[in-house]
């Protein structure tokens, strides 16, 4: 599960530096000029909205033969981040061809018609340019990172890799072997194995059940011809999204895109809503492993980014995370790293994670903290503190062009449109204690637990009793 430790911020959703500066300046002016608290609140809200508008105005949206393009201008930036995103994610694949999109993108970044593998590596190394790929349940991407000075040449290589990959046998086998080795190692590491087991339980009957990364068996079965066919059916502008962040001119960029990606066929791909997850009862699956501690994770359904509930849910998850750390680690020393987490998927999840020798006592405490969050009054100062910390992490994480490109893509593909990425802060500031309690009651229930460890040491009743009962 993505970002389960919550020691990381949620998947690349941040504002630009200019946004941060504008808010800080507006707040300072407000505090200095308005003596009344109510007036300060009104001015702060107005300043934030103005900052949102200013940041959104840096984004230019345009269409090239059905390809949607988002360009975020960052004047003076010395780097450029580019992502060619493929819509669909797990919905593009089946049990039989899971992993083909990941392998296709990986092999494409190895060699292309005009840049065989050795030449591509030499050129990229000379410029310090990076081309890579990424896949998740909702979309995948071919990614480019370069300096502004080397963007022109880097763009040539990137577009050639995207549009004219050679898929030579030796290149495909190289990427294949790396992927297979990684997939076969999944069961060696308890944390990784825990995620694989959790996915089988949580996503049964759902499109997410077919992992975009595939399995060792499926990845090993693909041939270069399979990749060529999949590439041909995927490279349609209706299936793609291009996001670029850097100090670039939109007019010049349009010409470059028209002469490259703009020549692709449109196709007729139409995104469909993702089926939401539904857990009707708490469950527990225990896998025997001779380990010094038990590895435990539990999932509950969570609101998607398009839901108004996502904002109080972020606060609720953060409060729970902090309370678990205090109660489980600091006060009782039951575990080194208890955590609560919240995802950013179209069919979203949240959950608990812990490693503990005394699994039963640890889970009593953790489920007790969920119950407390659901039923005891929450201090408004706690909510404000969490939001303030979130803002700090938010802005720090927004410092790179790659993070901003990822944020725009996430909200465009999963969050109801890229403009919503600029409204997160104000939505969070509007969260009240009652909202936090409400979403905790609504979503933090029917938890599906997976445990790796000693089945004899696990009290099933503790894990499957509903929080709050």
Q: Residue locations for each model-derived region?
A:
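Bacterial N-terminal signal peptides
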Residues: 20-33
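C-terminal regions of mature proteins
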Residues: 39-51, 241-246, 353, 384-469
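An aromatic/glycine/proline-enriched structural segment found at the starts
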Residues: 41-47, 204, 212, 237, ...
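Acidic/histidine-enriched segments that form metal/cofactor-coordinating
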Residues: 44, 120-230, 383-402
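Buried hydrophobic packing residues in well-ordered domains
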Residues: 66, 84, 101-104, 124, ...
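M16/MPP (pitrilysin/insulinase) zinc-metallopeptidase core fold and M16-derived inactive scaffolds
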Residues: 83-148, 211, 319-332, 341
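M16/insulysin-pitrilysin zinc metalloprotease superfamily fold
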Residues: 110-114, 145-176, 342-397, 464-469
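Short acidic/His-enriched helical or mixed secondary-structure segments at domain edges of catalytic enzymes
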Residues: 178-197, 275-293, 330-334, 376-426, ...
């Amino acid at each position: 599960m993505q970002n389960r430790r919550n020691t990381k911020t949620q998947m690349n959703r941040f504002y630009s530096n200019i946004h941060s500066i504008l808010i800080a300046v507006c707040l300072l002016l407000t505090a200095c000029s308005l003596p009344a608290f109510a007036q300060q609140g009104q001015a702060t809200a107005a300043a934030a909205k103005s900052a949102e508008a200013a940041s959104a105005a840096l984004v230019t949206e345009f269409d090239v033969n059905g390809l949607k393009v988002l360009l975020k201008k960052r004047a003076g930036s010395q780097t450029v981040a580019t992502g060619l995103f493929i819509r669909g994610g797990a919905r593009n694949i089946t049990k039989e061809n899971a992993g083909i999109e990941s392998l296709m993108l990986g092999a494409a970044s190895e060699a292309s018609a005009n840049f065989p593998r050795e030449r591509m590596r030499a050129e990229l190394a000379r410029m310090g340019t990076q081309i890579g790929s990424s896949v998740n349940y909702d979309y995948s991407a071919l990614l480019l990172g370069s300096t502004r000075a080397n963007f022109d040449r880097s763009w040539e290589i990137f577009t050639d890799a995207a549009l004219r990959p050679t898929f030579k046998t030796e290149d495909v086998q190289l990427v294949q072997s790396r992927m297979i080795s990684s997939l076969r190692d999944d069961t060696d590491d308890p944390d990784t194995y825990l995620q694989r087991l959790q996915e089988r339980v949580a996503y049964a009957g759902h499109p997410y059940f077919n992992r975009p990364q595939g399995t060792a068996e499926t990845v090993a079965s693909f041939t270069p011809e399979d990749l060529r066919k999949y590439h041909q059916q995927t490279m349609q502008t209706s299936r793609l999204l291009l996001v670029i962040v850097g100090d670039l001119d939109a007019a010049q960029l349009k010409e470059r895109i028209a002469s490259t990606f703009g020549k692709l066929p449109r196709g007729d791909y139409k995104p469909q809503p993702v089926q939401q997850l539904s857990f009707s009862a708490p469950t527990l699956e225990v896998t025997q492993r001779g380990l010094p501690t038990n590895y435990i994770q539990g999932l509950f359904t969570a609101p998607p980014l398009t839901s108004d509930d996502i904002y109080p849910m972020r606060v609720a998850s953060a409060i729970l995370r902090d309370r678990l750390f205090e109660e489980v680690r600091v006060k009782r020393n039951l575990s080194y790293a208890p955590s609560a987490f919240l995802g950013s998927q179209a069919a979203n999840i949240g959950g608990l994670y812990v490693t503990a020798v005394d699994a039963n006592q640890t889970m009593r405490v953790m489920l007790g903290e969920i119950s407390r969050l659901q039923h005891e009054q929450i201090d408004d100062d706690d909510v404000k503190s969490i939001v303030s910390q979130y803002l700090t992490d938010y802005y720090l994480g927004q410092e790179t062009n790659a993070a901003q490109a990822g944020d725009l893509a996430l909200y465009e593909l999963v969050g109801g449109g890229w403009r919503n990425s600029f409204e997160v802060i104000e939505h969070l500031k509007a969260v009240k204690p009652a909202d936090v309690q409400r979403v905790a009651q609504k979503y933090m229930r029917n938890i599906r637990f997976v445990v790796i460890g000693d089945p004899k040491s696990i009290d099933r009743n503790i894990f499957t009793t509903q929080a709050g009962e």
